[in-house]
Structures are given as structure tokens and as C-alpha cells.
Amino acid sequence: MMEILRGSPALSAFRINKLLARFQAANLQVHNIYAEYVHFADLNAPLNDSEQAQLTRLLQYGPALSSHTLAGKLLLVTPRPGTISPWSSKATDIAHNCGLQQIDRLERGVAYYIEASTLTAEQWRQVAAELHDRMMETVFSSLTDAEKLFIHHQPAPVSSVDLLGEGRQALIDANLRLGLALAEDEIDYLQEAFTKLGRNPNDIELYMFAQANSEHCRHKIFNADWIIDGKPQPKSLFKMIKNTFETTPDYVLSAYKDNAAVMEGSAVGRYFADHNTGRYDFHQEPAHILMKVETHNHPTAISPWPGAATGSGGEIRDEGATGRGAKPKAGLVGFSVSNLRIPGFEQPWEEDFGKPERIVTALDIMTEGPLGGAAFNNEFGRPALTGYFRTYEEKVNSHNGEELRGYHKPIMLAGGIGNIRADHVQKGEIVVGAKLIVLGGPAMNIGLGGGAASSMASGQSDADLDFASVQRDNPEMERRCQEVIDRCWQLGDANPILFIHDVGAGGLSNAMPELVSDGGRGGKFELRDILSDEPGMSPLEIWCNESQERYVLAVAADQLPLFDELCKRERAPYAVIGDATEEQHLSLHDNHFDNQPIDLPLDVLLGKTPKMTRDVQTLKAKGDALNRADITIADAVNRVLHLPTVAEKTFLVTIGDRTVTGMVARDQMVGPWQVPVADCAVTTASLDSYYGEAMSIGERAPVALLDFAASARLAVGEALTNIAATQIGDIKRIKLSANWMAAAGHPGEDAGLYDAVKAVGEELCPQLGLTIPVGKDSMSMKTRWQEGNEQREMTSPLSLVISAFARVEDVRHTLTPQLSTEDNALLLIDLGKGHNALGATALAQVYRQLGDKPADVRDVAQLKGFYDAMQVLVAARKLLAWHDRSDGGLLVTLAEMAFAGHCGVQVDIAALGDDHLAALFNEELGGVIQVRAEDRDAVETLLAQYGLADCVHYLGQALAGDRFVITANDRTVFSESRTTLRVWWAETTWQMQRLRDNPQCADQEHEAKANDADPGLNVKLSFDINEDIAAPYIATGARPKVAVLREQGVNSHVEMAAAFHRAGFDAIDVHMSDLLGGRIGLGNFHALVACGGFSYGDVLGAGEGWAKSILFNHRVRDEFETFFHRPQTLALGVCNGCQMMSNLRELIPGSELWPRFVRNHSDRFEARFSLVEVTQSPSLLLQGMVGSQMPIAVSHGEGRVEVRDDAHLAALESKGLVALRYVDNFGKVTETYPANPNGSPNGITAVTTENGRVTIMMPHPERVFRTVANSWHPENWGEDSPWMRIFRNARKQLG
């Protein structure tokens, strides 16, 4: 039976207005829209009155409900029948944890009530299309239609392909019907293999073969033999990449054979809990560094949010599945798309060349894609710390004559670093009889054929297959799986994982054969043991779907009870689906039909399939010299600062958590004004050291339209000039990931790809001492479509994205572009040696030109000398600032440095030649250093010692004030206010935020950037930051116990434990499953802290599902109530823990006036470094801190304080229960965005109880208790930041 329960409004007022505007633009006469959530409960037995009331309360979440009279035509959007949404699985979990076992399943839809003039049936179809994602959702016309969500279909049988009867044609037909993307020689191979086996292939076997042997999975082009201009080439592309490792194997522990590469890290204290006692402690050992960068281009073109989200999720799984299990740590992201053409903000260089129907626009990609990637990282709990964004779309005269070049098929880059134990770097042996396990969520009928689909140019496959090949995301599930992997590797020698791979392209059909084959075994599997949410799926769909958040593992049979225990504690689903066999054979049995859908020797599937040969011709681009007739420097500056590649990226940065882990030493946002211009990202290796890891990106794709090899060399060079900002030491410590994107088969591109790979693999990297131990290729970067009577193609430039990774010797020495106004000198290091080439620059692009000669690496020895000199200067603390020269040239380098420093610049460029335009806008390698005036001679002397004398030019200095002045021999070349330039640079991000988020918030933020008087973040302390008030108590040797409480989806518990540990506590890991299972009680704890994250993925309201699992479970409710009523206890709730505890008001004495925390006013997840003041309150944790004003990490989507009415707010204030408030940079309490990131009234962001024993706050003090973890801080802070005082106060209070 199904029960229907109404929920809260689903759309904010500004979202409704945006939707109405979209309908008007499509000429659909819709006058009004109201949308609310509707819940559907599938019951196996009726609920009694008490249970009914409990369910009703469970489904009351989000902003307070206001009465609304429903009017208009109903369009009900629900998940697709036959699927179970991530929301459903988590909401059902919560219901069961609350004791409501009569509920088989909860599901949620959005009921849209549309008031419109008379619309035709076709127009109503258009309206419906605007309201749902056809990939994951459907539209019903009545609420009762939702019963279809709970219909269980009968399993479908396997089907065979009549090869023996119909011959080769049967395979050709199956190839088209199933979208297998098989080549002619592969069809021949399969015909021969199955004829030899004497039987017809099943569809599942062909599908499995196609996925496992797709270009996406097998990298056929990179392993191919090459003939160029009639001459056979000596090496494959992959062999040239491997040459970098053969030349420089230093520090590499694993390359080319696992899900990620591994290099040597630092010996530090890794902090985690003991399996038996739950007690957190430091474990001194090497934290080796793993690195991986993926792309997810095809799915992002079809459906950007899930495409980018699952791209990030897949790369995170690659990291976790390295060796015998590893820990993902920090991420990077990148996007290349065609022109944005923001409505009302179109730029002079943006022409509309059309696009295929099946893919979305560049604007859609950049609106939804970054949100999807960020949301996955946020919910998983991985900070996203660096990235790139390029737009390019133009008709150009390139290698193949005049043609359209751009990124209709986008690049969506997802990468990152992690850490791994030394004894887990290499995978173990799979013993015969080992249990073969799928860890993670159930199989669902989504993401079919992703590997094959990604291997085709867009437009070659059927549109329905394109949509079928996109996956969907459930990051909270992936977090649960990662917690299991963490528990395994933390066991050290007792790690039960022998072998692990992630499930990606091709689903289990690729992952399981790869697992057993890599382990030298075969596998015997049972299809129906695979967890599945859709009973009607065929064997092909169960085995080959690409449902996300899954891993395949081999675990020895005697270790299965331990593995089971770990999974149950973390609530991570798993299934044993087979056994490892001695014979390298793959068999899959189907219990339901008692047949054998797969019965193949592994060498048929993964053996010597036909090798590709590429026979290609070279084409050379001539280019045309830049026509500069109508270009003025003033206009060029304005245009270049509006090019999205150059323009401010705040809209891409603040949506992503940049502080989770408490180990982020350098994020994108720089200085007191938080300007996104950092050259590289830096993390600490641990919570007890200054060793670290760095990441940077280099990419100069448009240059490939003139010179393939130069583009590749520049990508390496740019990654190097970016990462040189931190203290690494030996250049051989730097390892690169190379991600190659090309339109294989397009005239000239294959030979160009070979040139580019050779340039870096055989020449530049070996000469520099750099290794490329990891990478990926995407060889189908072209879209085709019909525009009227014309067949069109959009081909991307050959695109190499280099990501550089390195061990850092001291994270405190990292430089930023933030200028200082003390007596200083600005020096240009011009590695272009005066060439000043303007081909394929931002300047050329904004004037719709390509130019002829591009930048290049002019002198490899000088590039190496630059890096070595920088390392000496960084270590000696001789530099005040550094910023590389890249897109937009020297002009943009200087402008961004001035923005970060909120100061003026006075420079003279006479020494750079008479061509001022070329001097300011060329994109040759190099950058600007700022030194103290007194150090200038010594720095120039040192640079000369490293062979850079002819590259160094004194420019001028940074000055206090607002003027940005460039002269040549004292004649003004360009002069403007820095604030004006800052506003120009910010307009793209402003317009994107207005479109995507609450426009009122976007306007407020843009206005703040135009305020030259803004003093920036600043600190006022009412206490001595260096006084350790907990020291006397620590000296006694007594360590009170704090329960570090987490629920599934919580991700900030480790740094929280570390902060309490430092203050003298024994931090104990307590999962809600421990409390619900009765394994742990709260009676032995002196303090309790509820940590941040996304419990249950914020399903049923942020923190609300977690709270209700406490309130509706009598025994656990009693545990909490007893704890809160016990004297001499302390409790802290942070972020998700704050939201959760605000819903436990009925259990916490003195909390009756606490507010609720609901969706941010911006309607967006906000990651900010915000200024707060400590107010007078009873809070015992904030004693002695009143009046202090300091920045703190903020990361939440639902942090806005909601009170019942004005009287409620007044009572909260008058009782003195407000503990922290947001203030602006002038020190005034504020409700203005973004100083107040969520719109809370009177800046309220923390409250306490009347006795001060329980304090809850939305910001994260635990993430910034170390000074190095603060995005900006005063120079005189030592190891501990002021926020450490909270935790020491806790220790002091307990005596």
C-alpha cells in the first residue's frame, strides 16, 4: 500500500522567477508556479497512530511550512519507475533506524502546480521537459501515478546472438543495436573466437567485450603502431610517455599498473582511531603520495551535473582503490567549453555556430557541471583546491584550413592526491578461493555503455544510447565505502583487502575480469548475488551497468567476518558474488533462470585482441599575423579581463569546500581580500607536521592550433612555473599526470598528437628530470550535427592538461601573488627571452584571430635554472610574492597581484621592447617576483648564477593606493584604477552567479568588490594566542574522554578529534551504529562533539535525519538525554552536528530558544573564510574570548538561522545565548552577503545553552586550529591559531 504525505516548498521565490523567465523566453504562457515536495511511503503493514505521527514528523524538514492553496495543472516529477533514488535509499535508512520497519521504501517527488494560458499538448510537453531530467526522472499527471514507482518487474533473461546461423552479419547488427563501437577487425576476432568455441555469443558477452576493449578502457591509440608520412615510427605513444619513467624513476613507487600512481612522501604522524579501542592517536610512518587525474567529457556534455559529479566520484574511487586501499585527500578540477554567451552579457568574440540537439550549451555546462563536481567533493569530504577554466570556440585557419574549433564536447577534468601506507602500495596476491566482493550501492539500470560511448565522437551514436551512458551520483554512499577502506588499511598487516579496483566504465563487466586477471586468477560468479534495486533488469543490465560508488575486492575467506564487521559498522552495503579460481576462466551463473550468461576463457576477453595501426599524414598550420589595426591597449585590457579563461573564478571556487580535513595549507583564495589567484594548491602531510603535498595545473590548448608540440611543452612549463611557488627541492620530486584530448582521425590531428607526445615524453621531461607516471587519453573530441542543410563539425584543439604533484618540505614557505606595499621591487623573469609571441593568446582570441607564431619553451636549461633558483629563494624566504605569466600575459599577472594585495602598481616596461602590446599580452613562460628593495641586488645576482641574467627585468614597485600605472620611459602606456580593473575582472563571475544563484546575493558580492576602502580580513584578540591554558591539566596525565560522534556521511571527525587530542583529551571514535547497536554508551564520556559533514546526504533536512534517529529510538534517546542532564559534561555541535543538535532541543536543558538552521539565502553551498566576533554568552567553550574578532572556515548549504518570529529572536538575544556573529571587515555585525554567507538575522552563527555547557555553531574551528590551515593569517601567529582556545577551554572546564 502507498501513503502520500505533503512536504515543504521545493523552490525559493527567485528560483520560481527564473523558471517563469525560462518559460517566457520559450514563448510558453505560464503565469504562476508553485512547487512542493511530496513523499510516497510504500508500506508492508498499516501504521498505528503513534507510528503515523512519527512518520509525519520525520518528513517535516527544511524551512517552516506556510499554508498554500494549490491551483493549476499538476505535473509530478519523480525518479524514473524501476529505479531507486539516492534520496530514497537514505530516507528509508533513516526510517528504519527510527524503528519504522513497516516502511519498505520512501520516495520523494516534486509536485509542480502550473497556472497557464491555454497551452497545446506539445507546449505542455515542453513545460514538462523544462522541469525534469529525462535521464533520471519522469513526469506524472496525478499523485496516485506514483504507485508505479513501487511496481516490481520480473527479471528478463539473457539473449543470444545467432552468429553460427547468420554469420558475421549478426555481429554487425548487434554492434549497431547495442552501441558497441566495435572495429571491423574486432568483429572478425569475435567471429573467430566464438566459432572456435562452437557456440553463439550472448549479448552480455559481446557487451562485456566492447566495454573492456573500448578505446576508453584499452587506450588503443596510445598503444598503436604509427606510420607518419609513410615512415614507420619507432615507438608507440605510451612508450614515449614511459620513457620519462625510464629516464627519471626517482621517488616513484608505482606507475602505469594501478588505479593511481604513487610517489614517495614524508614520514609524519598519520592520525586515526585504533580498531579495538576507538582511541585516536598519531602513527609515525611514511605517508606516500598517490596521484590521479581523470576526465569525464562525454557524460558532462549530455547531463552536466551528474556527468561532472560522477567524474569526480570515479577519480576519488581510483585513489581509494590504489594498492590495497588508500586515502583520497584533496582534489582538482578543470573545464574547457565553447563560448558561454551569457544572455545580456555576450562578448564581441562570441559567435553562435550552433550545436547538436543532444548536448547542452557551454553555459549549461558551466552552470550545472561545476556544481555537480563540487557537490560530490563536498559531500564526500574532499577539498577541491585548484583548477582551470577555458572557453574557446572560433572559426580559424589551422592545420586543416578554415574550420570550427571549440569545445562542444567539453573537457571535464577531475583529479587529486591521496596518501597510502608503504606496505599497501603494491596489490597483494589473490589466493584461490578468495571471496570476490562488490562493495557499495546496488546495481541500477543507468550508465550503460559509458566506455564505448565515450570512445565515439558525439553524433556517431544514438541519442538514447547517449543518455543511457550517463551515470548518477551518491557521494554519501561513496563516503561510507571509503570509511570501510580506511578501517582496512588502518589495520596495517591485518588489512583484509588483498586486491581492490573501482567500478567505472563498463561496470562489473570490466571491473571483475580486470580484478581476477590482474591477480592472475579466474572467477566464478553468481549473477543474482549482485545487489540490485531493479528486479526487472536483464543479465546484461545487471552485469554491465555503471552504477556508481562501487568497488570490487578480493578478500581471503577467513577474513570475511572481519570485513563484514567493518561494513556493518559503517553501514556500507556489500555482496560476495563469486570465488577466485585457479583456471583463468570467467563464468557467470544465473540462479533465476539456471543458465550461464557468461562462460569464457579470460584470454578471449582480455587477450591479444587486434592491435591498431595509425597511418597518418602531417599537416602544418601557417596562421596569419595578428591584425592589430583596431587594437588599443585600453580596449585590449577590458576585453581580456572579460575572457572567462582570464576572468575571476569565484563562482567556481566558493561552491567547493576548501577546508575539510584541516590539512589545507593553500587554497585558491589569497590574502585578506580572498582573491582566487593562487598558483598551486598545498596540503599538509599530517596534522602534526609542516611537510606537505602540492598540486598545480598547466594547459595551453589553443597554441596547438598553430604548433602541437609547443602547446604540449607550454603545458609542462606552466605546471612547473605554478608549482615552483612552494618549497619542493629537487625537481625530480615533481611528478606529472598527462591528460590528452584529441579528435583522432581528424586531418592532421593524429600526427600532431604524436609530435606533442614526443615533445614531452622523449625530449622536454627527460631533459628537465620530470616523470609522467600517470595519465589518461580521450580521443573523440569532436561533435557533428546538421544545421539546416549544412553538415557541421566542431573539433576541439589538441588539448594536453598537465597536473603536477610534489612532496613539499615546508608548507609555511608557499608564496602567493599577494603584493606587499613595504619598500619593494617587482622583477619580471622572462623565460620567453624577448620573443613576445602573440599567436593563440587571449589577446588574439578576444579579437577573433589566431595569429601565427605562438609562445614556446625557448630554453630548457633556463626553465630548469628558473625552477632551481626559485627553490633557493623560496627556502630562504627572500621573496614576498610570486605569480606566473599565463593567459592574458604580463598585464594580467600584475593586475591579479594588485587585486590580491589591494594595492597600486607602478611599472615601466621600456626594457621589454618597443612593442608594448606584445610586451603586455604575450603568454611566454615566466612570471613576476616581488622582493624587498634591500634584497633586490642579491636576488638578481642569484638568478644570474642560475643562468637567468638575460631574463630578469626590473619593472617597478607595488604602492599603497588604487592606481595601476604602466609606463615606458616614463610615458604612460596604460593607467586605470585598480578597483575598475577588479570590477571588470569580476563581471563574468557576477553574471554567472546572478544566473545560477540568488541574484540579490550576487549583486551584494559584486558591490563589495568595488569598495576600495574595504580593509580586508583582520584580527582582534582579547586573549594571548600563545598561552596554553590547558597545559597544567595536561601535565597531570589525566585525559578526559570525548566522544567524537559521527553518523553515515559525516566527514569532519578526524580533524575534530585531533583538536581535542591536542588540548589533552582522549578522543574516541563513536559511530551512531555503535550507539544504536548498544556497543558503546555515553556514560563513560566527559564530553561529546557532533561533527560536520552530510549525515544521510542531508536527506530529510541537514542534520534532521540524524537527530530523528536519536529522538525516535528510545534507548539512544535516553543515552543522550542522560548525558545532557549530567553535570560536569560539555558538548559541542559543529556544522552538521550543529544542525543535528538544534533538533534535539527537547533533550538539552536550556536550549528551548535555539533556532533551526535552513537553506542559505544564496540557495547555494557556501565555502568561505568568514570573519566572526565572539559575543558575551554563557558558553564555557568561549570563555575568555569575548570581543575577539577572527576569521573561520565556513562550509555549508543550510546554515541560515530560522526563528519562529521576531519575539523568538528577541528572546534568544536577550537571554544572551548568541555566542558568535558574522561581522564585516569593518567589524560591524552584518546580514550582507558574502560577509554573512547564509543570511542569518543579526549575523547569528553560534548559540549556547543557559548553563553554557552545550554550544553549537555552523563554522568550523576544528579545521583551522592550526595556523597553517588558515587561508590567511597574520604573520606573527605561531603553530596554534586562536581557535585552539575553544578546545583548551574545554579541557580547563573539566579540570
Swiss-Prot record:
The active site is at 1135 (nucleophile), 1260, 1262. It is found in: Cytoplasm. ATP binds at residues 307-318, 386-388, 678, 886. Keywords: ATP-binding, Cytoplasm, Glutamine amidotransferase, Ligase, Magnesium, Metal-binding, Nucleotide-binding, Purine biosynthesis. GO terms for cellular component: cytoplasm. Pathway: Purine metabolism; IMP biosynthesis via de novo pathway; 5-amino-1-(5-phospho-D-ribosyl)imidazole from N(2)-formyl-N(1)-(5-phospho-D-ribosyl)glycinamide: step 1/2. Residues 1042-1295 form the Glutamine amidotransferase type-1 domain. In the N-terminal section; belongs to the FGAMS family. Phosphoribosylformylglycinamidine synthase involved in the purines biosynthetic pathway. Catalyzes the ATP-dependent conversion of formylglycinamide ribonucleotide (FGAR) and glutamine to yield formylglycinamidine ribonucleotide (FGAM) and glutamate. This is Phosphoribosylformylglycinamidine synthase. It comes from Salmonella typhi.
